[in-house]
Amino acid sequence: MGLLRKRGDRVDRRRASSWALANPAEYALIFGSPVPGYTAPPDTLPAATRTPRALLQILIDGVRSGALSDTGPAGLPDDVRADFTRIREEHLPDLPEALMARGFLGRTHLFGAVSFEVFGQFDEVVEARDAYFDFQMRQVAELVGL
């Protein structure tokens, strides 16, 4: 979490979670079960990619500032490496493979945690949800290298 503290911005670090809890139906439309045969209109793409882009930008900023470095190969299976190579070439040329892989892992954990809370998976299990969410995100930040 050192890099996040150094960034100096005071954004609400629970923004994705807070929005999802306040707007569960909208969250479900974006991140819930797909509707067979439905393709979202192109104008919805910016909203759907806002959080992933912000997460990746934190990693890119960390690389550019020298606070994050490539830790070598990500250990990706070859077919996944091909996917990530394509994504990096098209959208994220400044992000080393290992950091990109960890960033995607962080995104998966973030939305998994939010989805568990929004869809009631913690009901009658975890009462201190804010504290648990913060704990999860600290663990994910460490895993990602932040």
Report residues per predicted region:
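C-terminal peripheral helix-coil segments that are non-catalytic and often amphipathic
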Residues: 53-146
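Short alpha-helical scaffolding segments that buttress acidic/His motifs in well-ordered protein cores
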Residues: 13-16, 30, 106, 110
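Divalent-cation-assisted or electrostatically stabilized phosphate/pyrophosphate-binding catalytic cores
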Residues: 41-42
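Short linear capping/connector segments at secondary-structure termini
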Residues: 31-38
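Hydrophobic alpha-helical connector segments
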Residues: 1-26, 36, 45-52
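Short amphipathic alpha-helical segments with coiled-coil-like heptad repeat character
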Residues: 28-30, 118
